Structures are given as C-alpha cells and as structure tokens.
C-alpha cells in the first residue's frame, strides 16, 4: 500500500464586508454557523485536513477582512496563495459589483502571473428572500472569467463543502502541474552538458 502524498495549500477567501466570509469558513471547517457578526481585521486563519484521491491536503484558509480601508493591508496576505474563493452576498448588489476589484487585487499579487490561478465564486445567503443578484447574472460573470460558481448558504450548509473542495482540487492540480514543470525543467540537459567529453 502506497503512503499518501501530503501537500500543504494556502487558500484565501475574499469579498466585500458583510458577505459572510467568516461564516462560510466556520461552516466548512467546524460545521457550525457563525452567527455573531464581527468584522475581520486583517486576516484570521483556520486549517482543515482533507483527502483527495491519493493525497492528504492540509488546507490553510485565510479569512481576509472586507473593509475598504484595510484592502491594501489585506492584499499582502494573497501572496503565496494557491487558490481563492471570491464571495458575495446575493442580497447585496454592491458586493457583486465589487467582485472585479477583489479579483483584480488578488491577481495583481499572484506570482507568476502567467500561471493559471484557481478561483471559485460563491453567492452566499441564498436562504434569504430579498435576493438582488439573479443567478443568471452571476453565472454570466463566471462564464466570462472561466470561474466555477456555487450558490451557497453558510447558515443552512448548502454547497459549502462542494465549493471549498472544488477549489482545493483545482489548487492541487495547479500545484502538481507547477511541480512537474519545475522538475522537467531542472532535469533537461543543455546541448553542451549532454555531449560526453574526454580529456
């Protein structure tokens, strides 16, 4: 029996203030709904270990603050991340309209830029009646950017696990691809090195 590979991945969750990022994270990691609203200042980190195929993943998930005045500070936490959950509140049109800014902030901090970077969009609070962002509009935004979309409820635990694990799977694929490319590049011999020489 082969031992499982172990991989550590850093994921981030970003979006406007009040969209439920902390509640989504607590629902995923602890299976509890985080009702008491407190603004996240900077970032907080939770970890979860999951198994995908033959790999044990340790997910370190950074919950970033959504306040405008902290955006430049928060964006420093994006560096070195392997994937991102973009979140908005389906009852708050402004949180949806701000997604391009959040996505742009994340992509501006990711190195190397030429690599694909896994993202998933979550439309949270589908349990509430006063919806302002139609599902079709969010799906259209995602189609343009080739990002998977999930309608979720942190309160009722709808699609939360599926969304996080879709991102984890894509982040793992990217990690493995980068690792393979790096190994391939380091193994290649230059023409001069490949010729055998004699004294």
UniProtKB/Swiss-Prot annotation:
Task: Place the motif Switch 1 on the sequence.
Answer: 28-41
Name the chain's protein: Ras-related protein Rab-7b
Q: Which GO MF terms does the UniProt record name?
A: GTP binding; GTPase activity
Q: How does it sit in the membrane?
A: Lipid-anchor
UniProt tissue specificity? Expressed in heart, placenta, lung, skeletal muscle and peripheral blood leukocyte.
Question: What does the UniProt function comment say about this protein?
Answer: Controls vesicular trafficking from endosomes to the trans-Golgi network (TGN). Acts as a negative regulator of TLR9 signaling and can suppress TLR9-triggered TNFA, IL6, and IFNB production in macrophages by promoting TLR9 lysosomal degradation. Also negatively regulates TLR4 signaling in macrophages by promoting lysosomal degradation of TLR4. Promotes megakaryocytic differentiation by increasing NF-kappa-B-dependent IL6 production and subsequently enhancing the association of STAT3 with GATA1. Not involved in the regulation of the EGF- and EGFR degradation pathway.
Task: Give yes or no: UniProt keyword Cell inner membrane.
Answer: no
SMART domains attached to this UniProt entry: RAB (SM00175), RAN (SM00176), RAS (SM00173), RHO (SM00174)
Where is it mostly found?
A: other
> One biological-process term from Gene Ontology?
protein transport
Question: What does the domain comment read?
Answer: Switch 1, switch 2 and the interswitch regions are characteristic of Rab GTPases and mediate the interactions with Rab downstream effectors. The switch regions undergo conformational changes upon nucleotide binding which drive interaction with specific sets of effector proteins, with most effectors only binding to GTP-bound Rab.
In the record, the note on similarity to other proteins reads:
Belongs to the small GTPase superfamily. Rab family.
Q: Which InterPro entries match?
A: P-loop_NTPase, Small_GTP-bd, Small_GTPase
Extent of motif Switch 2: 67-82
Q: Which organism is it from?
A: Homo sapiens
The UniProt annotation places GTP binding at 15-22, 34-40, 63-67, 124-127, 154-155
Q: Name one Pfam family in it.
A: Ras
GO CC annotation: Golgi apparatus; late endosome; late endosome membrane; lysosome; phagocytic vesicle; phagocytic vesicle membrane; trans-Golgi network
Subcellular localization(s) per the UniProt record: Late endosome; Lysosome; Golgi apparatus; Golgi apparatus, trans-Golgi network
What domain of life does the UniProt record list for this protein's source? Eukaryota
Q: Where is the lipid attached (S-geranylgeranyl cysteine)?
A: 198-199
């Amino acid at each position: 029996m082969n031992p499982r590979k172990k991989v550590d991945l850093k994921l981030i969750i970003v979006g406007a203030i009040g969209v439920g990022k902390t509640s989504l994270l607590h629902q995923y990691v602890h299976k509890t709904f985080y009702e008491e609203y407190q603004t996240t200042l900077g970032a907080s980190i939770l970890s979860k270990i999951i198994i995908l195929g033959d790999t044990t993943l340790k997910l370190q998930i950074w919950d970033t603050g959504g306040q405008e005045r902290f955006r430049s500070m928060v964006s420093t936490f994006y560096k070195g991340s392997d994937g991102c959950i973009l979140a908005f509140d389906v009852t708050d049109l402004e949180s949806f309209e701000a997604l391009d800014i959040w996505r742009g902030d994340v992509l501006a901090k990711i190195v190397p830029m030429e690599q694909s970077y896994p993202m998933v969009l979550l439309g949270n609070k589908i349990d509430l009646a006063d919806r302002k962002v139609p599902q079709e509009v969010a799906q259209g935004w995602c189609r343009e950017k080739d990002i998977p979309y999930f309608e979720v409820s942190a309160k009722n635990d709808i699609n939360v696990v599926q969304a996080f694990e879709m991102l984890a799977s894509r982040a793992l694929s990217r990690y493995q691809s980068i690792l393979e490319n790096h190994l391939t590049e380091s193994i290649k011999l230059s023409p001069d090195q490949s010729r055998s020489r004699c004294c």
